[in-house]
Amino acid sequence: MNAPLTDNIPWTREEFEQKLRDKGRGYHIYHPFHVMMYEGKLTREQLQCWVA
């Protein structure tokens, strides 16, 4: 039931940065729909469905 002691060791700067970058890949700004919207590639109907 006790966590291993290694769980209490702080991440290195590089590990911390990598964990943040890995987490960021899941953000909505990278979703294909959002990318198409940002690039102006959505049809009027697609954009209206998103707004509704």
From Swiss-Prot:
Membrane-crossing segments per the record: none
Gene Ontology molecular function: any one: pyrroloquinoline-quinone synthase activity
Keyword Oxidoreductase: yes
Class of enzymatic activity (EC top level): oxidoreductase
Keywords carried by this UniProt record: Oxidoreductase, PQQ biosynthesis
Catalytic activity: 6-(2-amino-2-carboxyethyl)-7,8-dioxo-1,2,3,4,7,8-hexahydroquinoline-2,4-dicarboxylate + 3 O2 = pyrroloquinoline quinone + 2 H2O2 + 2 H2O + H(+)
Family membership noted in the UniProt record: Belongs to the PqqC family.
Role, per record: Ring cyclization and eight-electron oxidation of 3a-(2-amino-2-carboxyethyl)-4,5-dioxo-4,5,6,7,8,9-hexahydroquinoline-7,9-dicarboxylic-acid to PQQ.
Protein name: Pyrroloquinoline-quinone synthase
Organism: Methylobacillus flagellatus
